[in-house]
C-alpha cells in the first residue's frame, strides 16, 4: 500500500501558520518578558500575568503590530507605509488587536 502524502501547504496557509506562531509565542513569553534568564521557574502553560498583567493567552502589542502589517500587505498588495502607519495608529486608539474570548 502506498502511503498517503499531504499536499504541501499553500502560501496562505504558511502565512496563517506564521502569524499563529507569532501570537502563541508572544502569549507564552509575555509573563517572562524583561526577566533575567534563570530568574524564573520555566512555564509549561499559558499563565498570563507578567509586567502587563495580561490574561492567559492574551498577546501584546508585538502581535497587534504584526497583524496590522499583515493586513496592510494583503489589502494593499505590497508595502504601503502610509496605510501601515494608519493601521498602527488606529489599532492604538481602538485598544489594539487583542484576542476575543
Segments predicted by a language model, with ranges:
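Structured, active/binding-site neighborhoods that engage oxygen-rich ligands
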Residues: 1-101
